[in-house]
């Protein structure tokens, strides 16, 4: 920047500012400002021409007055005239005034644009920098229309100075954020990608920010940036390289650039090129290794820079979700931060582990830190850290730890910050329902929830507990007994009265045989709460009373007296008065048979998606992550409508889920002839009659298919137009899969038609039913499709998902294999060593055993192997095999027609880098298929 000359001090401006500061009152300040404004007007309108210095001084005074909060309605032309000056300070003040005071509707905008164009064309780097800063500061649509085509040329020009390139990149980024439709993507894109190799730190950092933003909207145009970003990142983090070593910040080389490069890589799936992928893995391993090294400085700047790179690397590992070893290492590293003395680090570790808990590969590793997280919930002083601890407990919850986590959440709820109580209530309700093996525990949990935090229990929660009690015969008597006992407390929350009134009205007869809960006692107990409740609750209790008339004829007279009282028949509330009159008349004139018909027990509710999860998402607020990304990061989307509780030994599912049950499978397996129940209308069969019309499988489809053998959620397919994400869950022979179709472009997809294609053999063995989707998918939007699945018999093939649509007048046709494999219906079974080997010997016929010896395709890591076997669906049996290095598993394949017991044994040979896998089942085809699927994972 040019040196400021002696005359640029502007003493008059300093005196004016001093006068303003010395004013004793608001009136004195306004008087001084008006005096100065009159002086400036006279100077601007005078016959004597002002020199550049005077214009600059007076424009600065006007700018200062404006910043004090006073309107300025003159001086704009003088500021524009300063833009034509060849003196840096005068031009600088002109641009400053324009950036702050001139709006896009000004009559001077054309003159301003001409001055900016002249400076951009001047090739004077200082003037070009001022012009670019002004464009970015104003950032209006008009500025984008005028200069969006010029700035890319400056950015990629070979003779542009580094400082100007940096400003041009940031200016273009600002315009793209303000008006993305006006920034053209053209020939310059390939050249701007190569700025990632620039040796100037400012240029490459600004270019990375620009490319990251552009790649989110136009991934195909910038896909070459992946290899360049990996290469540059490798040169930075590898100690042998000297790239940007001059930009080391507290012993961390170029930390800001490293973070931006890692963020850029999160715009894309894992690299397909093995060399690039291997190099990226080396980079991530190097970053994780450096995190384990002793700190090179005790200063906070060193740890901040080092941890910033580490956390962004962990975000990339989680985003790719394809390297089990890295995921487990990342989890272990974060576990060390959970007890760090720095609060911010503990917060970030908890937040990152929430995401890692959604991966099949790292979920078990996250669960090992449960005691530390529970301790954080109890001892952390910062409420935001405690909230993250709640989120992590919710994310790591599965059947093995659900009761412990729910108990801890309930304990914390009594002292929780009021701002997060409703969210915790919703999470407890979701977890209690999803992982309820014993539904008496579920009832106890919800009633305890109402007792502790009744004011925060929404209607969705107590509606849901009533639905589940009505749908489950085995819990109705217990629920009636429990609510009766709870209502005997001197002070009951109104929500408990609602639940108690409804349940006793339906099932009070189940406990009426006990003298302590006789019909009259039940009525008096409920009526003692009547006058303390709001109108809606009183209306519900009146309905309970008329139900009692049907259930217990002996209390009919007592209830009629209550309904006949003036407080009811002449109630000021119309609803209560109408109910009292109608119920009284009904109890008087209706015969016993009619009364029994009108007031019969409520039928089971249709199984449908619970609204509790939707309530939780609404409570959490809008997310910056797209639903398709959530498909990768979350485990499930809806709440179970009350499935049959499984035996404790076989209740664990292969894919733990912190969110909610996707399966609305009902209280019994669906009737084979009919479709599964649904809240969204009739289901339609989408088996294609013309599979020949489908496109060949998309590149990488087989690899993505193999990745989903041991996982249920993630991104199945992605190209420049379309992203397909999956969320799925299976229980016994039933499953439900949600497919998310995301439009990555800004243009509508028309005639959007997804079709499932199955061979004749597969159709006979696998039942698939789905709902149609909207044929129009807006740009940047996503649509969801649910697929209900039933395994009729064992199968070997997988269905193909074919998507056809029109994009920009062009017909698009994409086919991918849908990862529905036999092991999805694999339920784990715990067995003692003696039982295992006894069963192993029983399955000794040659046709019952399949064995495969194969070379390891991935690093032979014990923890990763365990995670894959559990993800495959088998129980991992500890201390069964005499050789502790071997892995032994057991489970049952559930189909509609049969249940097939399965035993497996995996023997690793570390020296030879080989595995021997043995499968024994009662059916040869099952042994063969499971062996094929599992051997591909190692």
From Swiss-Prot:
<dbReference type="InterPro" id="IPR009028">
    <property type="entry name" value="Coatomer/calthrin_app_sub_C"/>
</dbReference>
<dbReference type="Pfam" id="PF02883">
    <property type="entry name" value="Alpha_adaptinC2"/>
</dbReference>
<comment type="function">
    <text>Component of the adaptor protein complex 2 (AP-2). Adaptor protein complexes function in protein transport via transport vesicles in different membrane traffic pathways. Adaptor protein complexes are vesicle coat components and appear to be involved in cargo selection and vesicle formation. AP-2 is involved in clathrin-dependent endocytosis in which cargo proteins are incorporated into vesicles surrounded by clathrin (clathrin-coated vesicles, CCVs) which are destined for fusion with the early endosome.</text>
</comment>
<dbReference type="InterPro" id="IPR012295">
    <property type="entry name" value="TBP_dom_sf"/>
</dbReference>
<keyword id="KW-0168">Coated pit</keyword>
<dbReference type="GO" id="GO:0035615">
    <property type="term" value="F:clathrin adaptor activity"/>
</dbReference>
<keyword id="KW-0254">Endocytosis</keyword>
<dbReference type="InterPro" id="IPR013041">
    <property type="entry name" value="Clathrin_app_Ig-like_sf"/>
</dbReference>
<dbReference type="InterPro" id="IPR008152">
    <property type="entry name" value="Clathrin_a/b/g-adaptin_app_Ig"/>
</dbReference>
<keyword id="KW-0446">Lipid-binding</keyword>
<feature type="binding site">
    <location>
        <position position="53"/>
    </location>
    <ligand>
        <name>a 1,2-diacyl-sn-glycero-3-phospho-(1D-myo-inositol-3,4,5-trisphosphate)</name>
    </ligand>
</feature>
<dbReference type="Pfam" id="PF01602">
    <property type="entry name" value="Adaptin_N"/>
</dbReference>
<dbReference type="GO" id="GO:0030122">
    <property type="term" value="C:AP-2 adaptor complex"/>
</dbReference>
<feature type="compositionally biased region" description="Low complexity">
    <location>
        <begin position="645"/>
        <end position="668"/>
    </location>
</feature>
<dbReference type="GO" id="GO:0048268">
    <property type="term" value="P:clathrin coat assembly"/>
</dbReference>
<keyword id="KW-0653">Protein transport</keyword>
<dbReference type="InterPro" id="IPR017104">
    <property type="entry name" value="AP2_complex_asu"/>
</dbReference>
<comment type="subunit">
    <text>Adaptor protein complex 2 (AP-2) is a heterotetramer composed of two large adaptins (alpha-type subunit AP2A1 or AP2A2 and beta-type subunit AP2B1), a medium adaptin (mu-type subunit AP2M1) and a small adaptin (sigma-type subunit AP2S1). Binds clathrin. Binds EPN1, EPS15, AMPH, SNAP91 and BIN1. Interacts with HIP1. Interacts with DGKD. Interacts with DENND1A, DENND1B and DENND1C. Interacts with FCHO1. Interacts with ATAT1; this interaction is required for efficient alpha-tubulin acetylation by ATAT1. Interacts with KIAA1107.</text>
</comment>
<dbReference type="InterPro" id="IPR016024">
    <property type="entry name" value="ARM-type_fold"/>
</dbReference>
<dbReference type="GO" id="GO:0072583">
    <property type="term" value="P:clathrin-dependent endocytosis"/>
</dbReference>
<dbReference type="GO" id="GO:0098793">
    <property type="term" value="C:presynapse"/>
</dbReference>
<dbReference type="InterPro" id="IPR011989">
    <property type="entry name" value="ARM-like"/>
</dbReference>
<keyword id="KW-1003">Cell membrane</keyword>
<dbReference type="GO" id="GO:0048488">
    <property type="term" value="P:synaptic vesicle endocytosis"/>
</dbReference>
<dbReference type="GO" id="GO:0097718">
    <property type="term" value="F:disordered domain specific binding"/>
</dbReference>
<dbReference type="GO" id="GO:0019901">
    <property type="term" value="F:protein kinase binding"/>
</dbReference>
<protein>
    <recommendedName>
        <fullName>AP-2 complex subunit alpha-2</fullName>
    </recommendedName>
</protein>
<dbReference type="GO" id="GO:0008289">
    <property type="term" value="F:lipid binding"/>
</dbReference>
<dbReference type="InterPro" id="IPR050840">
    <property type="entry name" value="Adaptor_Complx_Large_Subunit"/>
</dbReference>
<dbReference type="InterPro" id="IPR002553">
    <property type="entry name" value="Clathrin/coatomer_adapt-like_N"/>
</dbReference>
<feature type="region of interest" description="Disordered">
    <location>
        <begin position="616"/>
        <end position="677"/>
    </location>
</feature>
<feature type="binding site">
    <location>
        <begin position="11"/>
        <end position="12"/>
    </location>
    <ligand>
        <name>a 1,2-diacyl-sn-glycero-3-phospho-(1D-myo-inositol-3,4,5-trisphosphate)</name>
    </ligand>
</feature>
<dbReference type="GO" id="GO:0006886">
    <property type="term" value="P:intracellular protein transport"/>
</dbReference>
<dbReference type="InterPro" id="IPR003164">
    <property type="entry name" value="Clathrin_a-adaptin_app_sub_C"/>
</dbReference>
<feature type="binding site">
    <location>
        <position position="43"/>
    </location>
    <ligand>
        <name>a 1,2-diacyl-sn-glycero-3-phospho-(1D-myo-inositol-3,4,5-trisphosphate)</name>
    </ligand>
</feature>
<comment type="similarity">
    <text>Belongs to the adaptor complexes large subunit family.</text>
</comment>
<keyword id="KW-0813">Transport</keyword>
<feature type="binding site">
    <location>
        <begin position="57"/>
        <end position="61"/>
    </location>
    <ligand>
        <name>a 1,2-diacyl-sn-glycero-3-phospho-(1D-myo-inositol-3,4,5-trisphosphate)</name>
    </ligand>
</feature>
<dbReference type="Pfam" id="PF02296">
    <property type="entry name" value="Alpha_adaptin_C"/>
</dbReference>
<keyword id="KW-0472">Membrane</keyword>
């Amino acid at each position: 920047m040019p040196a400021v000359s002696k005359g640029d001090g502007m003493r008059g401006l300093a005196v004016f500012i001093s006068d303003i500061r010395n004013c004793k009152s608001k009136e004195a300040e306004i008087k001084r400002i008006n005096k100065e404004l009159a002086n400036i007007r006279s100077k601007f309108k005078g016959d004597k021409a002002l020199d550049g210095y005077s214009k600059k001084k007076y424009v600065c005074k006007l700018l200062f007055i404006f910043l004090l909060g006073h309107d300025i309605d003159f001086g704009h032309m003088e500021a524009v005239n300063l833009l034509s000056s060849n003196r840096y300070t005068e031009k600088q003040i002109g641009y400053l005034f324009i950036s702050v005071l001139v709006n896009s509707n000004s009559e001077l905008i054309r003159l301003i644009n001409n001055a900016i164009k002249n400076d951009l064309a001047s090739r004077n780097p200082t003037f070009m920098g001022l012009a670019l800063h002004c464009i970015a500061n104003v950032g209006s649509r008009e500025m984008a229309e005028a200069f969006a085509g010029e700035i890319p040329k400056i950015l990629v020009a070979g003779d542009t100075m580094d400082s100007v390139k940096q400003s041009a990149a940031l200016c273009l980024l600002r315009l793209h954020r303000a008006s993305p439709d006006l920034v053209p993507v053209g020939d310059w894109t390939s050249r701007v990608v190569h700025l990632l190799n620039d040796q100037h730190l400012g240029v490459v950092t600004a270019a990375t920010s620009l490319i990251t933003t552009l790649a989110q909207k136009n991934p195909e145009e910038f896909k070459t940036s992946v290899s360049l970003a990996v290469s540059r990142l490798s040169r930075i983090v590898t100690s042998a390289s000297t790239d940007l070593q001059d930009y080391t910040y507290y012993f961390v080389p170029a930390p800001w650039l490293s973070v931006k490069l890692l963020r850029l890589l999160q715009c894309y799936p894992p690299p397909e090129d093995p060399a690039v992928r291997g190099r990226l893995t080396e980079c991530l391993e190097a970053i994780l290794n450096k995190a384990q090294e002793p700190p090179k400085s005790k200063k906070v700047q060193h740890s901040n820079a080092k941890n910033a790179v580490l956390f962004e690397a962990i975000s990339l590992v989680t985003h790719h979700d394809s390297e089990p070893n890295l995921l487990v290492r990342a989890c272990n590293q974060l576990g060390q931060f959970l007890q760090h003395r720095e609060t911010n680090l503990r917060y970030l570790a908890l937040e990152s582990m929430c995401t890692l808990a959604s991966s099949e590969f790292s979920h078990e590793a996250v669960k090992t830190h449960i005691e530390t997280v529970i301790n954080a919930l109890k001892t952390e002083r910062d409420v935001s850290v405690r909230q993250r601890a709640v989120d992590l407990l919710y994310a790591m919850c599965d059947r093995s730890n659900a009761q412990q986590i729910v108990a801890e959440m309930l304990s914390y709820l009594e002292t929780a910050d009021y701002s997060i109580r409703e969210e915790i209530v919703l999470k407890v309700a979701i977890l209690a329902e999803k992982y309820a093996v014993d539904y008496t525990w579920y009832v106890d949990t919800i009633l305890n929830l109402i007792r502790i935090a009744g004011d925060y229990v929404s209607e969705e929660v107590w509606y849901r507990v009533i639905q589940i009690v009505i749908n489950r015969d085995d819990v109705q008597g217990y629920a009636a007994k429990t609510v009766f006992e709870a209502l005997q407390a001197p002070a009951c929350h109104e929500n408990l009265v609602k639940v108690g009134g409804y349940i006793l009205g339906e099932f009070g007869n189940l406990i009426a045989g006990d003298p302590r809960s006789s019909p009259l006692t039940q009525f008096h107990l409920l009526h003692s709460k009547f006058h303390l409740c709001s109108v809606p609750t009183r209306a519900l209790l009146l309905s309970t009373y008329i139900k009692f008339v049907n259930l217990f004829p002996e209390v009919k007279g007592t209830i009629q007296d209550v309904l006949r009282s003036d407080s009811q028949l002449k109630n000021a509330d119309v609803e209560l008065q109408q109910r009292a009159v109608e119920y009284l008349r009904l109890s008087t004139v209706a015969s016993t048979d009619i009364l029994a018909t009108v007031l019969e027990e409520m039928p089971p509710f249709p199984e449908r998606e619970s609204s509790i999860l939707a309530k939780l998402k609404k409570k959490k607020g809008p997310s910056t992550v797209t639903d398709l990304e959530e498909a990768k990061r979350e485990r499930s989307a809806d709440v179970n409508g009350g499935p049959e509780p499984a035996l404790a030994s076989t209740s664990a599912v292969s894919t733990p889920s912190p969110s909610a049950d996707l399966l609305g499978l009902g209280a019994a397996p669906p009737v084979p002839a009919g479709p599964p129940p649904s809240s969204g209308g009739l289901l339609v069969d989408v088996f294609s009659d013309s599979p020949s019309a489908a496109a060949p499988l998309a590149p990488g489809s087989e690899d993505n298919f193999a990745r989903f053998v041991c996982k249920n959620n993630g991104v199945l397919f992605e190209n420049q137009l379309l992203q397909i994400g999956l969320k799925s869950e299976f229980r016994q022979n039933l499953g439900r899969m949600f497919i998310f179709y995301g439009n990555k472009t800004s243009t509508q997809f028309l005639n959007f038609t997804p079709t499932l294609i199955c061979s004749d053999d597969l159709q006979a063995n696998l039942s698939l039913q789905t709902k149609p989707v909207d044929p129009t998918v807006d740009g940047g939007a996503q649509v969801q499709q649910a697929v209900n699945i039933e395994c009729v018999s064992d199968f070997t093939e997988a269905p193909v998902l074919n998507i056809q649509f029109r994009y920009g007048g062009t017909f698009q046709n994409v086919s991918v294999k849908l990862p529905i494999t036999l092991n999805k219906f694999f339920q784990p079974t715990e067995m003692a060593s003696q039982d295992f080997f006894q069963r192993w010997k029983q399955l000794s016929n040659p046709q019952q055993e399949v064995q495969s010896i194969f070379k390891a395709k991935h690093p032979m890591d014990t923890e990763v192997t365990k995670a894959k076997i559990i993800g495959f669906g088998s129980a991992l049996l500890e201390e069964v095999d005499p050789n502790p290095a071997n892995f032994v598993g057991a489970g049952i394949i559930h189909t509609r027609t049969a249940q097939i017991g399965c035993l497996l044994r995996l023997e690793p040979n570390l020296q030879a880098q080989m595995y021997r896998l043995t499968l024994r089942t009662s059916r040869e085809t099952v042994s063969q298929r499971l062996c094929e699927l599992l051997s591909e994972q190692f």
